[in-house]
Amino acid sequence: MLVVLLTAALLALSSAQGTDEEVNNAETSDVPADSEQQPVDSGSDPPSADADAENVQEGESAAPANEEPPATSGSEEEQQQQEPTQAENQEPPATSGSEEEQQQQEPTQAENQEPPATSGSEEEQQQQEPTQAEDQQPPATSGSEEEQQQQESTQAENQEPSDSAGEGQETQPEEGNVESPPSSPENSQEQPQQTNPEEKPPAPKTQEEPQHDSGRPKKPLLPFIANLIRERIRKLLARSPLGRRF
């Protein structure tokens, strides 16, 4: 922008100087013409008129010669100076800056693209493969085998007491189906005295069974206790002489 403004100012100055010189030359050319025409009008000799005409022609030829150089010299020299300066201002940045930046960017881009693709990805993959293998192998051997062993042991423990409990339950209903003989008032008085010490031991058995079968639902205790009491009463009646009478 500064270069363009300077060139415009110089052109304006040169045009102004050219117009001033043209005006001065025109004034100088008009003055001798008037001086030469005066003797012609006064009636001078023909040879003097011819000489005046030649002088006028020489003055006219000299005037354009004086007019041309400033117009050509100033503007042409300024234009010739401006052209190389403009070419210098325009060409170097286009060639030097862009080409150098492109040449610098190409190797930097190649360096940025190539190394991570070869070094980073391969090293990370190589590191991830052994770590994944280490993470996968130990739990398969340690955790699963230990859990299976624990489950098998717990299942075996849970099955054994259940079998024993099932056998006891199967035998109980068979005895409960036996009809009890009618009891007399004397037997009714003797029964609570004989059954009180024997009713206490079965209570802890019922409390211990749920401990073995913790995972299974608890069974009602009242019918189980009632069946035990009936069995004890029948056994006592069978042993006592009063029960044999009836």
From Swiss-Prot:
Q: Where is this region: Disordered?
A: 14-223
Q: Where is this region: 5 X 23 AA tandem repeats?
A: 67-181
**Cellular compartments per GO CC:** extracellular region
What span is annotated as the signal peptide, if there is one? 1-18
Subcellular localization, as worded in the UniProt entry: Secreted
> What keywords are annotated for this sequence in UniProt?
Biomineralization, Repeat, Secreted, Signal
Biased composition of type Basic and acidic residues is found at 197-216
The Low complexity compositionally biased stretches are 39-50, 58-71, 81-93, 104-116, 127-141, 150-159, 178-196
Please give the Pfam families that the UniProt record associates with this protein: Pro-rich
Q: Name one GO biological process term.
A: biomineral tissue development
sequence repeat extents: 67-89, 90-112, 113-135, 136-158, 159-181
Single GO molecular-function term? Answer: hydroxyapatite binding
Coiled-coil intervals in this record? Answer: none
Q: In which tissues is it expressed?
A: Submandibular gland acinar cells.
Q: What does this protein do?
A: GRP proteins have a marked affinity for hydroxyapatite. They may play a role in the formation of the protective acquired pellicle at the saliva-tooth interface.
Q: Output the PANTHER family linked to this UniProt entry.
A: BASIC SALIVARY PROLINE-RICH PROTEIN 1-RELATED, PROLINE-RICH PROTEIN
Protein name as it appears in the record: Submandibular gland secretory Glx-rich protein CA
